[in-house]
């Protein structure tokens, strides 16, 4: 049973309808009794049932259920938690409803994206992501393997139309070029990314109602050969391809002491008031020696640091309790390495310190110390740190923290940094490191970008019509600054390779052959011919750039030079 505020759902799964009917009725009766005793009522008008079944051509009996004296009506589809669920889980009605809502939002982008006076591309993409993509993202992992592929294709069409309007591109523009130019991944890859992130989060919380449905072996194996595999089967395949060991994800932890009962932790950020980028290292070192060290004169000093280089992570500790250099899982983030260092020194303090001992931990990770200070982190390693700190407080052992800038000549910090770097060259102990699920998000991003890059290269190699691939062999975004909307649109069209001047023949007749350049009549008209090769514009071109190829032009010269050439050549309103 799921309960969300004042909505709840009861569900059962079985091969026999009679068993489901009996179990549902028992639970409905229990809920009715509880509500009567506690002064609540369940609205029978808003209570419905759905019988989920496969369309195998057989008759499926609908259960007969009662809420009090009222018969519960069964419907073919119903909206719950923002998704429209139908009896065969095709999600056809949900996607149809989603398209209707998104098309209304698309009208806003149409108004804002006028090519002469509209908003800039960056702002339009923000509006698109806030109004349309957010709706497309919600619950998308549920219907990512929808039965009717045409429904998913309809979403792709709307998605592409919104991107095209943001860029000011023509309808003839290659689809993959639109994605790369806008730095907006295809919906198929977007759904995979969101599904994997969702899976990581659920894996860290075994108490979540969907955990067993997604990760129990029997759940995965039972759908192994399904034509339309559920999310559990898809996730298992995705994590395997991305080489993400989901069994090593740390389990969500609840603090031993409730947050409202925890004693606050002392964290000093006095040196953080100075901007490191504009402050001399000698000033930080002098300030540390004159202000910080005297304040902690009767404390035992401990220095910690984390390091990550070439996908290898380690941490180091320097203190009178001993030095430590230790390598940890390669999937660890630098944030995790810093936390592991602090966790290790606290364990050492706990095992060796006496009552009323005083320690100060110097660390150059501001984000880790902020998490220790606000005590609201959900990171399992950080919760372990906070639990150890509360235990030390009960034993009258004082531990305070102080932020110090890195690489400014503070002796203890430099030695801890050396220990961390030395740890990079050690071997990992034969131990399964359980990491926070957030540490695997970069691997998800890397995997999705890899799929996108393969798709980008494959499309170019197969069709050879994606002109943008010559400028952008990788999917890295191209940034445009300080241009008007009209100028931005021109640059986007030139980069994509489809302009009014070069492709208007397609708008007139899709079967018409590409014409020759009307200015020199020596070659087929194209963006490359106009910007690089056409002899008619050679003198004007030499005033602004001397590039030998389109890639050289867009890599070396600011877009404003290209715009000035287009204006002087009299082509500004023809692009």
Task: Indicate residue ranges for each PLM-predicted region.
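Short, conserved micro-motifs composed of acidic
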Residues: 26, 40-76
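RNase H catalytic domain
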Residues: 8-10, 14, 145-151, 189, ...
